A protein has these predicted regions:
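Catalytic-core regions of glycoside hydrolase
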Residues: 28-48, 88-92, 168-175, 182-318
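Conserved, mostly hydrophobic/aromatic
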Residues: 59, 87, 156, 169, ...
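Non-catalytic accessory regions flanking glycosidase/transglycosidase catalytic cores in CAZymes
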Residues: 24-86, 93, 145, 151, ...
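N-terminal substrate-binding region of glycoside hydrolase catalytic domains
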Residues: 27-145, 267-326
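Active-site groove signature of glycoside hydrolases
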Residues: 125-145, 152-188
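Extracellular/luminal regions of secreted and cell-surface proteins that mediate adhesion/ECM remodeling
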Residues: 331-459
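Bacterial N-terminal signal peptides that target proteins for export
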Residues: 1-12
Length: 459
């Protein structure tokens, strides 16, 4: 009799367990190319550039310091607001640089500093050498100017750090175009102490919006303040021209050569801070061809892979639509830039009253995703409308190329309506309300709803 009762209990327990674990949906998700206008990566035009003939998610612009700063602690943010609002209205995020001197343009030194007597050197290059035109280099050692730069950076950070309209900013402020040089008049550039104070000001107030510097510098550098161990990225503004290390003494200014000279911290910077830049203007457009015409052009993909670059200004593809083969190659190359996430599989288990979800993701790009954007799951109906959303604490930041798949998991309460016709989907939330969605390299991306990756049916 006892044996019969034991058997009955065993069978009942088995039936209860079977009733609890109702269905499991194990999905092998197919790969598909990701779009070239994923957010915070890719090729970047100047703001409002006519044509806009290549997919993009960001726009770049310069701003003159004197247009923004009217007194030691008096600022006019209207030009910045017009810029950011205009870019955001197109679903894009902004990269900007503020300058004090720009070859060929009038000085950007604020009027109150001119009236205080800050000296400005007017000079012109040999026309055979860029930058062409007249330059106005202020005395970067003048304490009044240095304090003004610190004041401006502080106000900028307090107002705009973490603003969802902003993608990145380049440090600017010092040197021609804000590029931290006054070549060939190196004697007019900012002394190291001024550079250090500018960097310290950025470090104090820009905690969320990434700041990028023009030149890597180690402790032993004679002309630049050491920055390899500071929380900044870099921008290579002679990309695919002065990028790869040639080993020649005359090319020691090339980007990868300067990285090596700055040490391991600079070489590994891309793991935690973004790399950007600009394709050298002489090779705009053609750099994407199988055989660029210009003899000095370096292989674009090799440069991407060795620098781990995330974004690049490249006006050549935005001035007019490229020929079909150039366009096709450029799209493929942009996919290699920055992050490129693929979800190979997902498992969805209905346990009666809740759903367990596990998802694997890999990064097949050349760099991580640097911003801490939120993520959420949703149950989508047949029309692609979310009938229920579940915020999840999953992180997509810090996943490096070549890392083992990152595993995400969550237990969710079942939606109130029957699950049979619902699809479980995932998205990364762009904090810019109408910003480009981050899209995965999967056929299920946007299948049931724009911006959502369909993981599988809710069992």
């Amino acid at each position: 009799m006892g044996g019969i009762l034991y058997s009955c209990r065993f069978i009942c327990c088995w039936l209860i367990a079977a009733a609890v674990v109702r269905e499991v949906s194990a999905e092998q998700l197919e790969h598909a190319p990701s779009p070239p206008d994923n957010p915070l990566k890719g090729l970047v035009p100047y703001s409002g550039m006519a044509g806009m003939t290549f997919p993009h998610s960001m726009e770049f612009e310069y701003l003159r310091l004197s247009d923004l700063m009217k007194g030691a602690s008096v600022f006019d943010w209207q030009p910045m607001e017009v810029l950011l609002t205009g870019i955001a209205s197109r679903g894009n995020q902004a990269i900007f640089r503020v300058w004090v001197e720009y070859p060929g343009k009038e000085s950007g030194l604020p009027k109150f500093l001119v009236e205080q007597g800050v000296k400005v050197a007017r000079w012109k290059n040999d026309p055979e050498q860029p930058p062409a035109g007249v330059s106005y280099s202020p005395d970067y050692a003048d304490e009044r100017l240095v304090q003004a730069l610190e004041s401006f950076i502080t106000a900028l950070g307090q107002r705009y750090d973490g603003d969802p309209r902003l993608a990145y900013l380049t440090a600017g402020l010092l040197g021609s175009w804000g590029e931290w040089h006054t070549w060939p008049r190196d004697d007019l550039f900012a002394p190291v102490k001024t550079q250090q104070r500018v960097l310290a000001a950025y470090q104090r107030v820009l905690k969320r919006t990434p700041v990028l510097l023009r030149y890597p510098a180690g402790e032993a550098h004679s002309g630049f303040a050491a920055n390899a161990n500071l929380p900044f990225g870099y921008h290579d503004d002679s990309f695919a021209w002065g990028t790869l290390d040639s080993g020649k003494e005359s090319d020691r200014w090339f980007y990868l050569a300067t990285l090596k000279a700055a040490g391991d911290s600079a070489l590994n910077k891309w793991r935690t801070h973004p790399i950007g830049g600009e394709v050298r203007p002489e090779i705009w457009g053609q750099v994407h061809d199988a055989k660029p015409e210009h003899a000095k052009a370096q292989d674009f993909l090799t440069c991407v892979e060795q620098t781990h670059v995330t974004w690049l200004m490249e006006s050549g593809l935005f001035e007019k639509r490229a020929a079909p083969e150039r366009y096709r190659r450029a799209v493929e190359q942009v996919r290699r830039m920055g992050y490129d996430f693929h979800v190979p599989n997902a498992t969805i288990t209905n346990e009666g009253g809740r759903v367990k979800v596990s998802v694997s993701v890999v990064n097949q790009g050349v760099a991580p995703f640097y911003r801490d954007w939120g993520m959420e799951l949703a149950a989508l109906d047949a029309e692609g409308h979310p009938v229920q959303r579940w915020p999840v604490d999953w992180k997509i930041t810090g996943l490096l190329p070549g890392d083992a798949p990152r595993e995400w998991s969550a237990a969710l309460p079942l939606p109130k309506q029957p699950t049979g016709k619902l699809t479980l989907a995932l998205r990364v939330i762009n904090p810019l309300p109408n910003g480009k969605p981050l899209r995965f390299a999967n056929t299920g991306q946007d299948r049931h709803a724009p911006g959502w990756l369909s993981l599988g049916p809710l069992p």
